[in-house]
Amino acid sequence: MREIVHLQTGQCGNQIGAAFWQTISGEHGLDGSGVYNGTSDLQLERMNVYFNEASGNKYVPRAVLVDLEPGTMDAVRAGPFGQLFRPDNFVFGQSGAGNNWAKGHYTEGAELVDQVLDVVRREAEGCDCLQGFQITHSLGGGTGAGMGTLLISKIREEFPDRMMATFSVMPSPKVSDTVVEPYNATLSVHQLVENSDETFCIDNEALYDICMRTLKLNNPSYGDLNHLVSAVMSGVTTCLRFPGQLNSDLRKLAVNMVPFPRLHFFMVGFAPLTSRGAHSFRAVTVPELTQQIFDPKNMMAASDFRNGRYLTCSAIYRGKVSMKEVEDQIRNVQNKNTAYFVEWIPNNVQTALCSIPPRGLKMSSTFVGNSTSIQELFKRVGDQFTAMFRRKAFLHWYTGEGMDEMEFTEAESNMNDLVSEYQQYQEASVSEGEEEYDEEAPLEGEE
């Protein structure tokens, strides 16, 4: 069956990854040590997308855990699902990358990368028909960003025809851990544009907003944020892991979502999101789910899609959902919001259904959107990058690891190109021969 090999790099990647494995182990009826004690055959049917079967009814994740310092790994190992992972699949250095992209990409990370690739190769050889790789990492740090992108390009060389999906945590405007985030993120985006097939953009600030506004948590922890991310990751891969009426896999998702190869940065959302106390006051229905996933407040990237237009989007519904109802709701959304969908891609919403809901819910839905408003995210990082780069602030940390200023300039211009490509398609109309008219103006009045 169509297996996926999962990599998690850096502290952020490992923590999101751990939450993801916890979520899908629960969905497949595995306990903390990987022993199956589920209730339904459906849980077993496609277990091998993410798990290898070992002896004694034990299942082992196809996960490779990478970090340049041992701390995070120890935390994962000591966590509730620490016994799940194969001990050989922990690959870690001792030095740490110190939030320095150059260390992760060129010096420290480059020394460790062959070791990681050996493990990846071994996992890939254990697959019948490998579908692709998914990697969780953040773009603001050193290991996840620098070494993560190095791994992506190396895996790309070795498995050119396999899908590469990344779940990338973008630096957010208000929640910043390090000063050099804009540098690290710009250098990473420069790599992702070239080497990834689909990048799901997640951003801490948007996750905080969801926790505070929708889930009514007063001081959300990283655990709460990671739980949200793992819900989306589980949703995106549902169709691979359970039989459904209308299935989708990484490649189908990419074919439907990526109109131009460089524009593969998606916004994601999840529904139902309700605060713990309000569960009993709401019925989860298809219209309710559809309204929630198209609500800007539920997007896990801090950019408002009302400032742009959707090129394409995909909605994945789980649970006992009627096909017709989904179609009607989606058509309804498109008719009401025609201004937010480009008219030169008709039927640009793809739907997928899976009959098995996540634990504890009757139905749920996951949203993936390719919207031109994602450019706000890149613009924001780009402005911060330019401000520092103009003064050459902090550059010596990077040049000291053997980087060249040229690389920074290239990365900056590549990201600016990406922004202008998004802008160009946002303004494009069906009849390109006509004069370009400014479509942004009428949207202001609607708010």
UniProtKB/Swiss-Prot annotation:
PROSITE patterns annotated for this entry?
TUBULIN, TUBULIN_B_AUTOREG
- Please provide the record's keywords in A-Z order: Cytoplasm, Cytoskeleton, GTP-binding, Magnesium, Metal-binding, Microtubule, Nucleotide-binding
**Statement: the UniProt record of this protein carries the keyword DNA-binding:** no
Q: Which residues bind Mg(2+)?
A: E69
Q: Where is the composition biased (Acidic residues)?
A: 432-447
The record's Gene Ontology cellular component field reads: cytoplasm; microtubule
Its biological purpose is as follows: Tubulin is the major constituent of microtubules, a cylinder consisting of laterally associated linear protofilaments composed of alpha- and beta-tubulin heterodimers. Microtubules grow by the addition of GTP-tubulin dimers to the microtubule end, where a stabilizing cap forms. Below the cap, tubulin dimers are in GDP-bound state, owing to GTPase activity of alpha-tubulin.
Cite the record's note on assembly.
Dimer of alpha and beta chains. A typical microtubule is a hollow water-filled tube with an outer diameter of 25 nm and an inner diameter of 15 nM. Alpha-beta heterodimers associate head-to-tail to form protofilaments running lengthwise along the microtubule wall with the beta-tubulin subunit facing the microtubule plus end conferring a structural polarity. Microtubules usually have 13 protofilaments but different protofilament numbers can be found in some organisms and specialized cells.
- Report the PANTHER family cross-referenced here: TUBULIN (PTHR11588)
Protein name per the record = Tubulin beta chain
Record lineage: Eukaryota, Fungi, Dikarya, Ascomycota, Pezizomycotina
